[in-house]
Amino acid sequence: MLRCAVKKFAYFATFLTIVANIYIYTYPSFHPEQCSWNCSNKNAPLQKDLTFVDKVKNYFSDVREQWHGSHASAGNDEDIHILAFGDPQIKGIWPKTPYVSRLDTYGNDYYLGHIYDMMQQRLKPQVVTVMGDLFSSQWIGDSEFHNRTKRYISRIFKRDPTSIENIKQQNLDEKGQYKANWPEWGDRFNEILDNVKENEADNQELSFGFGYENIHSWNPDLEDFLIINITGNHDVGYSGDATYQHMTRFHDLFGKDNYWIEYETNTTHPWRIVVLNDLLLEGPALQPEFVEATWIFLNQLNERKFNGSTVLLTHVPFYKREGLCVDGPDTRYYPDAHAPESYKSGLLRSQNHLSESVSNQVLNMIFENGKPGIILTGHDHEGCETVYNKKSTSTWEATKNIESDVFVKEITVKSMMGEFNGNTGLVTGHFNTDSMTWEWTFSLCPFAIQHVWWFAKVSLLVTIFTWSSLLFV
């Protein structure tokens, strides 16, 4: 009797396990339009217009294409393919963290890693970018920052952590843990900053080394794509919080926070990636020299008079009126009696958007040539799509639709966290040989709430255990 009941349960558990695991390993095929690179076939019927039978056929057809790797080669070979992930915000584990929370944090790393694995294997992007807020808090010690970086690199993005381990060995404290050498980094930073300011009139770029050209991978021996990590407020803080310690450890473990990479500059279709730490554009700032350095970066970028298209990657969205996105404009400052950090009184504490004046300045400097481009941001976990239309007064107005001959799209990439359904942003850049301009399209590929991933994994363990138990009943 017991054996019969266990066997029935084993069959039921097996069925659920198969269904759940098929879903988590083929979920992009349930949204083939959203989870594939944009291609030139504009006549294909939309998924929402198909019958149920046609949707099922599309699903199996897409699974077959994924199995054979057809999605990675979809479209024109000259197209640009970028995967964008919003605000993973991975949490930490502390000595008093309950075991259930430890397990949840451990599983969350692999939930996020599953999303990346599926999309990377399916689409083989040229660029992968994470839109800031890599971690859940900037108020963590250096050793914890290193620990989370190692988890982030190895568990989520399956990269070799050897380089950050080497950095740790070069910067050990008395307990053998990583400690950011911010006095040395700060001295070097200020030496460079002073040098740039002295030679500003001569436009010499001997210092921060903001510019690169035709970089397709930071480590070509290990990776055939470029990965870019943007600074978020939970990584380095807003300008009223950002310290030398914050900036040193980010530079140590992730690299520069401001730079550009130019591609195809001697062709008819040049384009570039601009990485901007827009957390350090406004103040009042705790370290005003950080803001000064960011504006030096923008001035040097503007002086290049680049004539191609721009992909701008940054964290905080540009100014827009209330109602266009979930997050409206909201800027806050530390009060005068902010204990125990009275030295922060009046400094910038948080902002949902850049201010209107700074937004106009930055957009005019980066998109001065009037060429089509695209902006990718994070910060607003719900995501948003807007268009910035340039007016005759050199101001930019955010709307939902194109209202000007000169415009740029801003995509706030919806968070990849489980509570927001584990999203991936897909950007396709296609050069139109008729208009001789780049065209940029975006789609959002959702996965599912993290409990679905957990169910698939737990159900597999339950199924194995149940079938094994039949040996003893």
UniProtKB/Swiss-Prot annotation:
Positions in the Cytoplasmic compartment: 1-8, 473
Topology term for the membrane: Multi-pass membrane protein
Coiled-coil ranges per UniProt: none
One GO location term (cellular component): endoplasmic reticulum membrane
Parts of the chain that traverse the membrane: 9-29, 452-472
Record keyword ATP-binding present: no
Other observations noted: Present with 1070 molecules/cell in log phase SD medium.
Name under which the protein is recorded: Protein TED1
Lineage: Eukaryota, Fungi, Dikarya, Ascomycota, Saccharomycotina
